[in-house]
Amino acid sequence: MTLDELKLQVKKDLEVDDETLDKESYKNQELYAKYLDHKTNFELLLYKAKGDYKILFKDKWEYYGGKADAKIYVSKPFDLKVLKTDLNIYIESDEEIIKLEHKIAYLETTIKYIDGVLRSIQSRGWDIKNAISWKQFEAGMI
């Protein structure tokens, strides 16, 4: 699931039907569980991506430092001698490293978005309660 798909789903799920406020209040727990599950899945993807990043960083450090297996240099030659102080420049500008950093940032952004959704679901109950109270007031019950 992408962030855009998640946003569309949230927009649909958080709509409140003014005519069935009683059912909407019960729906909160289901929604909270649903988005908590999404958050857990994205957090697991984030942990995996961070682990992949560490492995890739080590591989790139060996590659640019001249310590990688000879087979790697046959398939992907690198003829420069890089100083230890310059290793980070080469590693941080490597396309694979940048792609993985973008993936990590995307997952972190998605998790922050889901945290906001979870807060909205919690406040949704309060909003529904206020709407019910307002309807009672309008009907002269309060």
Where are these regions (language model features)?
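Charge-rich amphipathic alpha-helical interaction elements
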Residues: M1-I142
